[in-house]
Amino acid sequence: MLHDSDNLVAESLVLMLSGTAQWELNTQKGLEMLYQQNKTLKSQFQQVDGSGLSRYSLASPRGLLETLDKIYETIGTSKIKTLLPQTNSEGTLIRFAPQQNLDFVYAKSGSLRNNHALAGYIFSKANKPYAFVISVNNYTGDKEAIQAAIGAQLSFLHKKLR
């Protein structure tokens, strides 16, 4: 599910989670269960469905970064590369900033009109993962220009990492 975005599957998982605590399948109950399981996160999310990015769901870059840190603590380095798509080669990131080689980035993207976000891990030359979130809001240019700028920042950062 993480390599190719599938909102139907994501929504179904939230509904199934709610069904483990009650007989009725209910999105809000499933989301409440997710919040209860992740009480250690300091940032709060406002989620209206299981699909993730929408005009009604709210998540801050800090909240996404906390989530990435928790994922790393839970599954470690080896599984990150199998779960998230690699930039420029698979999933929803297959055409992300194609003019740059970003094979050291494993992430998920989200975009709505005039908003673009990329969250995931950048791997150093020593194969150490660093969580990152880049969120660009209220831009009026085309998405490809934003992706190229994000790609340039990630390339710059990768050169600085050891």
Predicted features along the sequence, with ranges:
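Short, well-ordered beta-strand elements
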Residues: 11-14, 119, 128-138
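Active/binding-pocket-proximal capping segment
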Residues: 77-91
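Short, Gly/Ser/Thr-enriched beta-strand-loop segments that form substrate-interacting elements
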Residues: 95-126, 135
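A small/polar active-site loop signature that marks catalytic segments
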Residues: 2-78
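Short, gly/Ser/Thr-rich active-site loops of penicillin-recognizing serine hydrolases
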Residues: 32-35, 152-162
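A short acidic/glycine-rich loop-to-helix N-cap element
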Residues: 138-150
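Short, glycine-/Ser/Thr-/acidic-enriched flexible segments
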Residues: 6, 52, 112, 137-139
